[in-house]
Regions:
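Conserved beta-strand positions in the central sheet of alpha/beta enzyme cores
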Residues: 1, 51-52, 80-82, 123, ...
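Catalytic cores of alpha/beta
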Residues: 16-49, 139-177, 193-195
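Conserved anion-binding
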Residues: 43-129
Length: 202
């Protein structure tokens, strides 16, 4: 849902999103351009959660007014905060607007604890390694493994079963993971059935 609201492209995106949600009720999350104006619509249409970044992180800072509005609109049980980040000066900062704009908010265990009362889950893309199939961000995962709270899902660079093992080890079995371009269904080499078997055996 990255096209601007009101454009023909947005309407086409919305139509396809609704069709997918109806086909698998409460099985999909929706992200991209989610605001307080459309979040409830996605939940009503069947999304289990909405994923939010830019609406909450405005002008480089956490906009607690918008965050409170979103929680009131859909409930924290339906809200995933996307804290996708890039490294700058040795620290990880949340980025917005298709990962192009740095915020002033650093991703730390303290930040995760501060925001956990507003959300059901965190989604954290390691933007510097995202989509490259060149390995995971071990430093970021190690930091996430120090957090005890709501579920955390890491994304970025997973391209092998060794990477999955590292996520489990470095994340102390507390960090979930997404796999994108490395999966066979997206043109990669990792067979979905083998991934599921590996995870269940682990």
């Amino acid at each position: 849902m990255l096209n601007p609201s009101g454009t023909p492209e947005y309407e086409m995106d919305m139509k396809e999103a609704e069709a997918a949600l109806h086909a698998y009720m409460n099985g999909f999350m929706v992200g991209g351009g989610v605001t307080v104006d459309n979040a409830r619509h996605f939940i009503i249409q069947g999304a289990s959660h909405v994923i939010v970044t830019s609406y909450v992180f405005k002008d480089g800072k956490i906009n607690y007014e918008n965050l409170d509005k979103m929680v009131r609109e859909v409930g924290k049980e339906h809200l995933v905060l996307d804290l996708s980040c890039r490294k700058k000066d040795g620290r990880y900062y949340i980025v917005t607007d298709r990962w192009q704009k740095f915020t002033d908010t650093e991703v730390t265990v303290e930040t995760l604890k501060e925001l956990e009362k507003y959300a059901a889950e965190y989604l954290i893309h390691a933007v510097d390694v995202e989509g490259k199939k060149a390995g995971i961000d071990e430093e970021l995962i190690s930091m996430l493994g120090e957090y005890d709270g709501i579920p955390v899902t890491y994304a970025g660079g997973v391209s092998s079963f060794d990477d999955l093992k590292k996520v489990k080890e470095l994340g102390k079995s507390k960090v979930d993971v997404t796999i994108g371009s490395a999966l066979s269904i997206f043109g990669g080499d990792m067979q979905l059935e083998d991934v599921l078997k590996f995870i269940n055996e682990e």
